[in-house]
């Protein structure tokens, strides 16, 4: 069980701080049911409520600094399997995002990055599906790593590149 003040990942939205754990005083809500009150750190003023008894697959622990460093160093070894069928590719992207798994998210980032380079060589742009999932995956992964490693978001990509090259 999470407690007030914990930071978690709300899949697929954002890093959130648990502001409260308890029953909600809102109309249409079971007043005997406990909820986590989450405050997304990048969406000031927003609130997300998740039933305490229904968190599986919806929130997860944020990774530790040590795990973040180990993850970054393992990024070159993450396999990015290409999927030729456009519909199946979007389904795989969606599954990776909804899993909340940094490894799966990094794999689709690598895949889309490679597709972007290949399409650029052909004088083409990325598909809107690839572009949309690339931005979402990049936001999810880089936001968590930036937060955990205390590196400004605008510098995290270079930080990762420098770490991989070291």
Predicted regions and their residues:
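Absolute protein N-terminus
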Residues: 1-2
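Conserved nucleotide-binding/hydrolysis micro-motifs of P-loop NTPases
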Residues: 23-25, 43-45, 55-56
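Charge/polar-rich, low-complexity and marginally structured segments
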Residues: 53-166
């Amino acid at each position: 069980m999470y407690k007030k003040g914990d930071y978690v990942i709300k899949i697929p939205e954002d890093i959130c701080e648990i502001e409260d754990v308890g029953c909600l005083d809102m109309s249409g809500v079971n007043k005997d049911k406990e909820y986590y009150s989450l405050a997304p750190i990048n969406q000031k003023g927003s609130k997300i409520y998740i039933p305490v008894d229904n968190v599986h697959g919806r929130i997860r622990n944020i990774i530790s600094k040590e795990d973040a460093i180990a993850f970054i160093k393992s990024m070159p070894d993450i396999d990015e399997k290409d999927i030729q069928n456009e519909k199946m590719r979007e389904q795989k992207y969606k599954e990776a995002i909804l899993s909340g798994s940094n490894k799966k998210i990094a794999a689709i980032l690598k895949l889309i990055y490679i597709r972007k380079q290949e399409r650029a060589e052909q004088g083409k742009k990325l598909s809107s599906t690839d572009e949309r999932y690339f931005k979402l995956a990049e936001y999810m992964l880089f936001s968590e790593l930036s937060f955990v490693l205390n590196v400004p978001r605008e510098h995290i990509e270079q930080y990762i590149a420098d770490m991989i090259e070291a």
